[in-house]
């Protein structure tokens, strides 16, 4: 299954020391894991919208549970707001639309 994953928000930084700590202990390790997931084809595509504090990617997982575990392993998991949308395949949608056409033709 494919999922659209959007992570946004997160803590602001009041002091440079705080920014340094969060960057070193949360942000950079999270990106390291994201790059690893991308290399293992668990993240198919993604990136960061220019000028935003948001991460967007398409993830591949066998189940909702697998994706949940994958996201929870990211150090930034508890720091950001996550929105996950399961994606229907184009092929699956075509089958549904063909069935709808068939049913409508039977009615008419």
Regions found by a protein language model. Name each.
Residues 1-108:
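Conserved, structured core segments of small domains
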